[in-house]
Amino acid sequence: MDCTWRILFLVAAATGTHAQVQLVQSGAEVKKPGASVKVSCKVSGYTLTELSMHWVRQAPGKGLEWMGGFDPEDGETIYAQKFQGRVTMTEDTSTDTAYMELSSLRSEDTAVYYCAT
């Protein structure tokens, strides 16, 4: 029996403040500790450049935890201190898709990951 810890990533779209925005995320992932995962969030109804995309997660039995997002005032992506060095958030404006990549995965990274605007 394989007793290796596996990390489950579930992704779901959070309702944004823009009434017509739809966010469609990639599906669930199972990863081993030490690996990395990249999840996507496709925007429709608006273009990605019109929005400020953020990523949050919710571990089992825990509250929502903000991971980072785009700061339109600075024009930069900012990350929560806890995730700096492990998370990268990017955007492909040609496809209106945002990405969040988390590396060096740990068992405590098991969570539902949300994109939100």
From Swiss-Prot:
<comment type="function">
    <text>V region of the variable domain of immunoglobulin heavy chains that participates in the antigen recognition. Immunoglobulins, also known as antibodies, are membrane-bound or secreted glycoproteins produced by B lymphocytes. In the recognition phase of humoral immunity, the membrane-bound immunoglobulins serve as receptors which, upon binding of a specific antigen, trigger the clonal expansion and differentiation of B lymphocytes into immunoglobulins-secreting plasma cells.</text>
</comment>
<keyword id="KW-1015">Disulfide bond</keyword>
<dbReference type="InterPro" id="IPR007110">
    <property type="entry name" value="Ig-like_dom"/>
</dbReference>
<keyword id="KW-0732">Signal</keyword>
<feature type="region of interest" description="Framework-3">
    <location>
        <begin position="78"/>
        <end position="115"/>
    </location>
</feature>
<feature type="signal peptide">
    <location>
        <begin position="1"/>
        <end position="19"/>
    </location>
</feature>
<feature type="domain" description="Ig-like">
    <location>
        <begin position="20"/>
        <end position="117"/>
    </location>
</feature>
<comment type="subunit">
    <text>Immunoglobulins are composed of two identical heavy chains and two identical light chains; disulfide-linked.</text>
</comment>
<protein>
    <recommendedName>
        <fullName>Immunoglobulin heavy variable 1-24</fullName>
    </recommendedName>
</protein>
<feature type="region of interest" description="Framework-2">
    <location>
        <begin position="53"/>
        <end position="69"/>
    </location>
</feature>
<keyword id="KW-1003">Cell membrane</keyword>
<feature type="disulfide bond">
    <location>
        <begin position="41"/>
        <end position="115"/>
    </location>
</feature>
<dbReference type="InterPro" id="IPR013106">
    <property type="entry name" value="Ig_V-set"/>
</dbReference>
<dbReference type="InterPro" id="IPR036179">
    <property type="entry name" value="Ig-like_dom_sf"/>
</dbReference>
<keyword id="KW-0393">Immunoglobulin domain</keyword>
<feature type="region of interest" description="Complementarity-determining-1">
    <location>
        <begin position="45"/>
        <end position="52"/>
    </location>
</feature>
<feature type="region of interest" description="Complementarity-determining-2">
    <location>
        <begin position="70"/>
        <end position="77"/>
    </location>
</feature>
<feature type="region of interest" description="Complementarity-determining-3">
    <location>
        <begin position="116"/>
        <end position="117"/>
    </location>
</feature>
<dbReference type="GO" id="GO:0019814">
    <property type="term" value="C:immunoglobulin complex"/>
</dbReference>
<keyword id="KW-0472">Membrane</keyword>
<dbReference type="InterPro" id="IPR013783">
    <property type="entry name" value="Ig-like_fold"/>
</dbReference>
<dbReference type="InterPro" id="IPR050199">
    <property type="entry name" value="IgHV"/>
</dbReference>
<dbReference type="GO" id="GO:0005886">
    <property type="term" value="C:plasma membrane"/>
</dbReference>
<keyword id="KW-0391">Immunity</keyword>
<keyword id="KW-1280">Immunoglobulin</keyword>
<dbReference type="GO" id="GO:0016064">
    <property type="term" value="P:immunoglobulin mediated immune response"/>
</dbReference>
<keyword id="KW-0964">Secreted</keyword>
<dbReference type="GO" id="GO:0003823">
    <property type="term" value="F:antigen binding"/>
</dbReference>
<dbReference type="Pfam" id="PF07686">
    <property type="entry name" value="V-set"/>
</dbReference>
<keyword id="KW-1064">Adaptive immunity</keyword>
<feature type="region of interest" description="Framework-1">
    <location>
        <begin position="20"/>
        <end position="44"/>
    </location>
</feature>
<dbReference type="GO" id="GO:0005576">
    <property type="term" value="C:extracellular region"/>
</dbReference>
